């Protein structure tokens, strides 16, 4: 009898009109329960409804995801602002509608879908399942789909889009985010991530296609449709072949006595890094056994982000000591970023920052270009790029060596987009990076790539070893030649969007309305650039050269003492990040003095501009 009552209750819940007192919420509840065919996420909403948890229902159902610096990204679970079966179907329907409008040959060229190894039992949600549903929506509309038959590194998707001449592609991943998250990363036909206006237009199309179409839930199409193709072997072979373009010392690599440890952080990277090492002539790197295989719980690390440093590299470093390996390489879970560490003579580990690795990459890629360039190659056609919050070291190298350096807004989508423009104009791009350990060596992939970066660092270390030089020693040589660049990057957590907004609005109206600060503590400010509003005091017309980015907060201060500091919000996480760098000329070699000056300025920046105690900000814990 009790079972029948429960059944009746569920039946009534499913079909009754909802009277929460909020018409918008009532409509959203009805839509969710009609459209969602995933029993677990449907049950999550039903339970909230049954328990009268209207605030949480409103939070989950009365807003939608927007495109950040890496596409759509959110927690997995039930709701229109979460990543789940229904929202991925809706997103893909919007993609289909937009692509059909943009490409008359969409149904000839097709679409690429890849995925990482994330998953969540409570919502029956995994990257693989979401990839299958993405494919199903398109297959049901007679679009050829290149669906990878197993997990792949994120860079394989943009690479495949280019090589297969597809109109676009999607990678289901949340990269290095916490285990609860997942994402939907979109690449255009060029192989670069989408930028405006495509992101806004796709969102409009998603909002016009929220009700699942007939066939959108039919993931059996992945097994039965003749339009489904598996590009894995072909793309892996071609990717590894293209890696040879940035391998310059294969014979030397094959003879090196250096040993390398690699960790894939419970993600996709192991097999692909092993293959890349083989292409470069190396013996296989030693894998960290506890982290080699996919694990969506990331059970051996407190967070799956190698950027967090020594605290998350513990297993790798201990294994390297045991195996007498001097260099540790860590790819993040979707293998698009790379961290590196080197054992020093004093027995301590040097974990390189993204900016320090970029200094080494910049030196290496230009040095290899000089030694291997064709007779008529002109240095004036050579470019390197970085995001505006990253170190200015490439700018210093470019000024001395004669090549071009350019900055973009944060996010590799801007770098990829600019590289396309440069390549179309006959320019050569050697290297690009963002300080958050994202590196691009060569232009086979127009996105950051941890697999290629890992093997390039190995070759660099192997080459330097023949001259008895360590990576750390070479970094010092780079700074001695081009000028010391001492940087610090960190963040505060803030879960209250109104607080974040008020912090930045205060800076825009500091001493009086529409007046930015002229000092930070005792440090005089020369220039202010605010790309959120498009203001730049260093320009004659006071307008920022970088594109306006109204969807995120970002203000950069240039100080009289040569320091550049930026405050910005994260596009993927609830963080306020700060970036600060002292840029010195080569004759300023007192690093202790530079570091002390930088520390004082950062302390002033935090105390005067962020005010963590007053604003309830949570300090980064490492």
Curated annotation (Swiss-Prot):
Record-listed alpha-D-glucose 1,6-bisphosphate binding positions: 73, 175, 336-337, 434, 436, 448
| Protein location | Cytoplasm, Cytosol
GO CC terms in record: cytosol
Cite the active-site annotation. 175
Name the reaction it catalyses: (2R)-3-phospho-glyceroyl phosphate + alpha-D-glucose 1-phosphate = alpha-D-glucose 1,6-bisphosphate + (2R)-3-phosphoglycerate + H(+); alpha-D-glucose 6-phosphate + (2R)-3-phospho-glyceroyl phosphate = alpha-D-glucose 1,6-bisphosphate + (2R)-3-phosphoglycerate + H(+); (2R)-3-phospho-glyceroyl phosphate + alpha-D-ribose 1-phosphate = alpha-D-ribose 1,5-bisphosphate + (2R)-3-phosphoglycerate + H(+); 2-deoxy-alpha-D-ribose 1-phosphate + (2R)-3-phospho-glyceroyl phosphate = 2-deoxy-alpha-D-ribose 1,5-bisphosphate + (2R)-3-phosphoglycerate + H(+)
| One of the record's GO molecular function terms | glucose-1,6-bisphosphate synthase activity
Signal sequence range: none
Task: List its EC numbers.
Answer: 2.7.1.106
Q: Which residues of this UniProt protein bind Mg(2+)?
A: 175, 332, 334
- UniProt-listed InterPro entries: A-D-PHexomutase_a/b/a-I, A-D-PHexomutase_a/b/a-I/II/III, A-D-PHexomutase_a/b/a-II, A-D-PHexomutase_a/b/a-III, A-D-PHexomutase_C_sf
Mark the residues carrying the PTM Phosphoserine: 175
Per UniProt, the keywords (alphabetical) are:
Carbohydrate metabolism, Cytoplasm, Disease variant, Glucose metabolism, Intellectual disability, Isomerase, Magnesium, Metal-binding, Phosphoprotein, Transferase
Q: Name one GO biological process term.
A: glucose metabolic process
Summarize the protein's role.
Answer: Glucose 1,6-bisphosphate synthase using 1,3-bisphosphoglycerate as a phosphate donor and a series of 1-phosphate sugars, including glucose 1-phosphate, mannose 1-phosphate, ribose 1-phosphate and deoxyribose 1-phosphate, as acceptors. In vitro, also exhibits very low phosphopentomutase and phosphoglucomutase activity which are most probably not physiologically relevant.
From the record heading the sequence, give the disease linked to this protein. Answer: Neurodevelopmental disorder with hypotonia, dysmorphic facies, and skin abnormalities: An autosomal recessive neurodevelopmental disorder characterized by severe developmental and speech delay, dysmorphic facial features, ear anomalies, high arched palate, strabismus, hypotonia, and keratosis pilaris. Early obesity and seizures may be present in affected individuals.
Annotated family: Belongs to the phosphohexose mutase family.
Q: Can you name this protein? A: Glucose 1,6-bisphosphate synthase
What species was this sequence derived from?
A: Homo sapiens
The encoding gene is PGM2L1
């Amino acid at each position: 009898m009790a079972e029948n009552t429960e059944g009746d209750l569920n039946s009534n819940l499913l079909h009754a009109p909802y009277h929460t007192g909020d018409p918008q919420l009532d409509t959203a509840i009805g839509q969710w329960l009609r459209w969602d065919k995933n029993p677990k996420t449907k049950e999550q909403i039903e339970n909230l409804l049954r328990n009268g948890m209207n605030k949480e229902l409103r939070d989950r159902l009365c807003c939608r995801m927007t495109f950040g610096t890496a596409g759509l990204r959110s927690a997995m679970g039930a709701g229109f602002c979460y990543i789940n079966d229904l929202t991925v179907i809706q997103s893909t329907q919007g993609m289909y509608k937009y692509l059909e409008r943009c490409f008359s040959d969409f149904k000839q060229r097709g679409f690429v879908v890849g995925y990482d190894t994330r998953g969540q039992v409570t919502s029956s949600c995994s990257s693989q399942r979401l990839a299958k549903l993405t494919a199903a929506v398109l297959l049901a509309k007679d679009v050829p789909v290149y669906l990878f038959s197993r997990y792949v590194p994120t860079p394989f998707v943009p690479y495949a889009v280019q090589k297969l001449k597809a109109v676009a592609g999607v990678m289901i991943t949340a990269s290095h985010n916490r285990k609860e998250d997942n994402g939907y990363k979109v690449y255009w036909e060029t192989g670069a991530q989408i930028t405006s206006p495509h992101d806004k237009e796709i969102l409009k199309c998603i909002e016009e296609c929220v009700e699942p179409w007939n066939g959108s839930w039919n993931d059996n199409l992945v097994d039965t449709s003749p339009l489904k193709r598996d590009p894995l072997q072909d793309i892996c072979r071609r990717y590894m072949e293209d890696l040879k373009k940035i391998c310059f010392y294969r014979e030397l690599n094959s003879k090196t006595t250096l040993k390398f440890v690699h960790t894939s952080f419970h993600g996709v990277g192991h097999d692909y890094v092993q293959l890349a090492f083989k292409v470069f002539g190396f013996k296989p790197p030693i894998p960290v056994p506890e982290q080699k295989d996919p694990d969506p719980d990331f059970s051996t690390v407190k967070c799956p982000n190698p950027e967090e440093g020594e605290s998350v590299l513990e297993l790798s470093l201990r294994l390297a000591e045991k195996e007498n390996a001097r260099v540790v390489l860590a790819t993040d879970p979707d293998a698009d970023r790379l961290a590196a560490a080197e054992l020093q003579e004093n027995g301590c580990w040097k974990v390189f920052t993204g900016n320090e690795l970029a200094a080494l990459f910049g030196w290496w890629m230009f040095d290899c270009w000089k030694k291997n360039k064709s007779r008529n190659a002109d240095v004036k056609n050579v470019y390197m790029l970085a995001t505006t919050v990253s170190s200015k070291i490439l700018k210093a190298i470019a000024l001395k060596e004669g090549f071009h350096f350019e900055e973009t807004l944060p996010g590799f989508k801007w770098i990829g987009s600019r590289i396309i423009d440069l390549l179309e104009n006959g320019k050569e791009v050697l290297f690009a990076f963002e300080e958050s350990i994202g590196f691009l060596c060569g232009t086979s992939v127009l996105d950051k790539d941890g697999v290629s970066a890992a093997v390039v660092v190995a070759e660099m270390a192997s080459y330097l070893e023949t001259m008895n030089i360590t990576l750390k020693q070479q970094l010092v040589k780079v700074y001695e030649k081009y000028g010391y660049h001492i940087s610090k990057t960190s963040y505060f957590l803030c879960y209250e969007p109104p607080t974040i907004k008020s912090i930045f609005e205060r800076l825009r109206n500091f001493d009086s309305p529409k007046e930015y600060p002229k000092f930070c503590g005792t440090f005089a400010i020369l220039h202010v650039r605010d790309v959120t509003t498009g203001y730049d005091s260093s320009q004659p017309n006071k307008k920022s050269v970088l594109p306006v980015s109204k969807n995120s907060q970002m203000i950069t201060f240039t100080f009289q003492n040569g320091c550049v500091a930026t405050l910005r919000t994260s596009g993927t996480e609830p963080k306020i990040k700060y970036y600060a760098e002292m840029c010195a000329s080569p004759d300023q070699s007192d690093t202790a003095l530079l570091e002390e000056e930088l520390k004082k300025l950062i302390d002033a920046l935090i105390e005067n501009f962020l005010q963590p105690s007053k604003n309830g900000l949570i300090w980064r814990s490492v």
